[in-house]
Amino acid sequence: MTIFICLDDADGLAFNHRRQSRDRILCEHIAALSQKGVLRMNTSSFSLFSGINALNICAEDDFMQHAQPDDFCFLECADPTPYLGSASCLTVFRWNRCYPADLHFSVPEGWKKVRETEFEGSSHPTITQEDYVKCEN
């Protein structure tokens, strides 16, 4: 499974159980990255993808319980740590600015960054994509 998350410069993930920001081009990018599999997300995140032609989206509140090894999971407002054991890849999208946050996440030991790229968002001048793979023991 591949997990997608968004973080700010201070590794902030959410504030008061809400996403820190949103970006239309980021959602289009996530849809394109996941087009060869199922893209799972909660029903709140699904609204971000309205108007994007992505027939592979499965939105349900307990989506992580149904995730399969080849699925892509867009996780907002929740700590991904409990799900990392089932994941083979982790993609972090960085907003490249700081937002208020009360939920933080740092990529733990055992994950190796294999790629870093940047692209222009619709509401963010630069979004950084960091791709990680789980290290083999």
Roles of regions detected by a PLM:
Residues 1-137:
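Enzymes that bind and transform nitrogen-containing heteroaromatic metabolites
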